[in-house]
Amino acid sequence: MPTHRLFVFSACLLASLLTSRVSAEDAAFESSRFEITQLTSDLIQPMELAVAPDGTVFFIELSGKLKAFNPVKHEVVLVGEIKITTEQENGLIGLTLDPNFSDNQWIYLQYSPPDFPGQHISRFTIVDGKLDLASEKLLLKYEEQRKECCHHAGSLSFGPRGELFIASGDNTHPHGDSQGYAPIDERPDKAPWDAQKSAANTNSYNGKILRIHPLSDGTCEIPDGNLFPKDGSKGRPEIYCMGCRNPWRMSVDQETGIVYWGEVGPDAGADGPRGPRGYDEINQAKFAGNFGWPYFIANNLPYADVNFETGEVGPLFDVTAPMNESPNNTGEKALPPPTSAFLYYPYSDSPEFPELNGHGGRTACAGPVYHFSEELKSNVKFPEEFDRSLFIYEWSRHWIKVVHLDKNNDLAQIELFMPQHKFVRPIDMAFGPEGALYVIEYGETWGVNPDTRLIRIDYIRGNRTPVVVASVENNIGKEPLTVFVSSTGTFDKDPNDLLKYEWRLINTADQKAAPKIVSTE
């Protein structure tokens, strides 16, 4: 009985450039020279990332796992796992590396313990590539209500002078009877719906940007320049900025020490008797201050005082002398005057910042400030055109934008980054030691996604890698078999380059005879 052998024809395309290379610094800036490389898709509900000096990319997952992408082996390893609760959007929510990570292997995490109603900010040591749980040094902890959802923020970032910045949310339910305006419900048993207990409370760690200076023994001290005196007489001494709703993603300019964060705003779609419509904000703190929530939003637009028992709408809050008279307030009544948001935009078009126009949801995030370095020897570092630029991004609207800053770190220009590419819900980003940008794309839904990935964005100088497309038709069958292969769609980004094509066959050792190849133009 005759037998029929089944084989698979495989092909690869080798494209070689036949032109001379140009100097890395000679070519003018071209936006088309940005290239995306997918590093891994092995991420499940990723939150934050941090890039080590050796290029290792650490990232955390909401479920409590700390993972690392090895740039040499191109693989993801589990570094460790923290016991957490994920109820009410809690979990492992913050990550940063010590400024001297190469020497001490210290990593900082913000997480939600199952046996404590709040958040822990702790330092751990990585030993032989694994998280040493016994090395934990608890730097700070603060309580939250877990009766109702939400707003935990969680972002961590070091400043240039060794200060650790900690973002905390207002821990307030955004819905209920506030109707998408200021959640200031003072009725009994309604504290989860009152942000005056947290963001506007000088005695609360919630709804804040905190600032401490970790010490080598695992304790911390209060640096100069925070909002309140170090003795705690006017408020928590760790508070750098108050009046925050949900500062979900934060970064610190590593040259100036200026703090940026994205403030996810409330849901009101239009102005009303209770006050202004909802806005998302990008905030900039050149120094300590009150950023207004829940009394003010955007460029200090005031909300109205509301009696939630009767529904009566009272006067607008006084922007010159805000007062917190909520029964849920445990701090000072008289508050510092608010600071306006740096950038802000509603659901609909923004008359103040048309570059941020868009529709649909809003989730403003603040990424890193890029500083170009002549001394950095790298063929992929971002060009000088992005020097002194803040990268902001939108989880809901799928974009990254560049905010160019002037010499005073004020707004100069906003432009869309890589306009030809749609980012799939960017959730965190950081520049690596080589000047490339690392980005986590969360994926399409608020859950576990098949399109989650970690990418690196390089700026390619000189000659660029061709875009290779190889397709195969009729590649499986019985002998004799005619297979059609094609390189249609292959092109070179440098138009004057010539390409050399080479087809190679693999897995042919067990065949009786080498296949006959016929090529066409």
Predicted segments with their positions:
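Surface-exposed, flexible coil segments in extracellular/virion-facing regions
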Residues: 498-521
